[in-house]
């Protein structure tokens, strides 16, 4: 009985509780009103921007990142061309584990996701243990792409074989 409360229960006994009628038994505690209001505001914001504009912005940043990363030695971009993506750039850097790359990028003020992304079958198909994943959205701009590229270039130089 100690794990139940609010309107989800009809009655509490010493050794058990009885459920309330629908929909109350699925609505324990205080409703998450703040998040509902925040979600509505976010939806209004995106509606005002227009989702076509959001997608165009993402793809422009992806194209820019793809272009500027193209000549980084050992860098492989995984997935379709930028025009067929929506905000996500998956890549690997030869001889650099994505977790190490993420740490270096963090030191450059760039936050990425590194790992298998709950997609181990894909990682096996790609022949890699993990990938790095950069994401772009409405709050990113060309400066963020530049920071990503600088950080990746730094990592490539740091892990380059001696004399290379």
Question: What spans do the regions from the language model cover?
Answer:
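Pyridoxal 5′-phosphate
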Residues: 1-164
């Amino acid at each position: 009985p100690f794990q139940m409360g609010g309107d989800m229960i009809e009655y509490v006994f010493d050794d058990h509780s009885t459920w309330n009628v629908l929909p109350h038994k699925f609505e324990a505690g205080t409703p998450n009103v703040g998040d509902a209001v925040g979600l509505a505001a976010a939806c209004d914001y995106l509606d005002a921007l227009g989702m076509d504009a959001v997608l165009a912005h993402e793809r422009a940043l992806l194209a820019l990142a793809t272009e500027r990363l193209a000549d980084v030695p050992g860098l492989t971009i995984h997935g379709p061309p930028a025009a067929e993506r929506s905000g996500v750039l998956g890549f690997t850097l030869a001889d650099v584990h994505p977790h190490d790359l993420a740490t270096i990028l963090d030191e450059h003020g760039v936050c990425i996701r590194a790992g298998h992304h709950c997609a181990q079958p894909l990682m096996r198909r790609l022949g890699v243990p993990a990938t790095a994943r950069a994401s772009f959205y409405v709050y990113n701009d060309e400066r963020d792409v530049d920071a990503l590229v600088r950080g990746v270039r730094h990592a490539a130089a740091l892990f380059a074989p001696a004399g290379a």
